[in-house]
Amino acid sequence: MPYHLSESHKKLISSHLSESDPEVDAIIKDEIDRQKHSIVLIASENLTSTAVFDALGTPMCNKYSEGYPGARYYGGNQHIDRMELLCQRRALEAFHVTPDRWGVNVQSLSGSPANLQVYQALMKPHERLMGLHLPDGGHLSHGYQTETRKISAVSTYFESFPYRVDPETGIIDYDTLEKNAVLYRPKILVAGTSAYCRLIDYKRMREIADKVGAYLMVDMAHISGLVAAGVIPSPFEYADIVTTTTHKSLRGPRGAMIFFRRGVRSVHPKTGEEVMYDLEGPINFSVFPGHQGGPHNHTISALATALKQATTPEFREYQELVLKNAKVLETEFKKLNYRLVSDGTDSHMVLVSLREKGVDGARVEHVCEKINIALNKNSIPGDKSALVPGGVRIGAPAMTTRGMGEEDFARIVGYINRAVEIARSIQQSLPKEANRLKDFKAKVEDGTDEIAQLAQEIYSWTEEYPLPV
């Protein structure tokens, strides 16, 4: 059979990356080196498995498959259908729910779009939702807005009213939430967080939602791996809808899932007539064709693999150690007289206040980056600026994946404390007329012997732990 293109074209499409595009290949190798030689503490990050990488880089990405299994708008989808159905089955199994009571959409491309797809499925424009206030640990996609500006697009399409934590305890103020919900009458009550370290009282949230006739939507993006492993309580007993990303504690590819109830929603108190859930059709329609075209089939394939791994004893072992390591973070920071928001953690991360140390999260984040520690500045209750907030968020999943244990996390706290001391010292050395964040960063760029020594020490230490690639 003749090949009707040039030999150079054949080489173009068959050469490996290192030969075809050395520039991109070099950047990827540099990123692998950074991950291998860094302490990665960003709570929303993890390190996925070699098998998941294998599934991601396959010809499954070639196929267009608008629609759903058995109802596609293109031909040639018989194996794509098999894969999506397998992924859905594994999703239900991983979270210990059955297909008679729950369904799941695995096509959503990421967490924020998944949340928007649920809102659009269940609400008309300018209907109301309530979510946790962003500086109190909520997420942008739960309708965040300030007094002067709608930040999240969700708050432009729908009306949002936040609930908050008790400023004294750092715990969600359920009593005030209930009072406000009775007045506000939201269509959807969102129980989900991005920087809240305590367990949510799903039973109480369910009672509040029922009292005002709202859907209870749980966004478990951060904790879905812990839920799947059964090491923290599951929201599925109480929720109407559950959304999650797939790349955080679940340790899969970058994607999202939307779980929705099936069956009887309620029974009319007078007539005894059953009121059925009507979530599956509207949510599926909102995902496609409402917000997306063809799904990313390579991601769905990799997600199926991650979900299989999430049902193993080894995955539970991993999640148990995540919780232990997070507790070490809590204990060791307290020993050094740091204040933790909500006074600690029940999950995979801690939120550390730096106000009492005379420095902010942006400056500590920058120094940490210079010594090969990746964490993130984070708003804490009472903050006015998300760019220069009063805290840092520190998560255990990624370094636990690499095999670090409790003694290692105690050592990590020591490194972070030294970074805080360096940041405070540099900030105090700046003149009043030039002490803004850009001035601080410029001073850090000048370098110190201590920063260089710490960077080399961490670079060498982290090399001892395997990085799946």
Swiss-Prot record:
Q: Which UniProt keywords apply?
A: Cytoplasm, One-carbon metabolism, Pyridoxal phosphate, Transferase
Q: Which cofactor does it need?
A: pyridoxal 5'-phosphate
Tell me the domain of life. Eukaryota
User: What GO cellular component is one of the record's annotations?
Assistant: cytoplasm
EC number(s) on record?
Answer: 2.1.2.1
Q: In this record, what's one Pfam family?
A: SHMT
Q: List the disulfide bonds.
A: none
Which Gene Ontology BP annotations are present?
Answer: glycine biosynthetic process from serine; tetrahydrofolate interconversion; tetrahydrofolate metabolic process
Name the Gene Ontology molecular function terms of this record: glycine hydroxymethyltransferase activity; pyridoxal phosphate binding
Q: Which residues carry this modification: N6-(pyridoxal phosphate)lysine?
A: 248
Cellular location of this protein?
A: Cytoplasm
Asked whether the UniProt record includes Cytoplasm among its keywords, one would answer yes
Please give the pathway this protein is involved in.
One-carbon metabolism; tetrahydrofolate interconversion
Q: What class of enzyme is it?
A: transferase
The family assignment reads: Belongs to the SHMT family.
What the protein does comes down to: Interconversion of serine and glycine.
Describe its assembly: Homotetramer.
What's the name of the protein?
Serine hydroxymethyltransferase, cytosolic
From which lineage does this chain's organism come? Answer: Eukaryota, Fungi, Dikarya, Ascomycota, Saccharomycotina
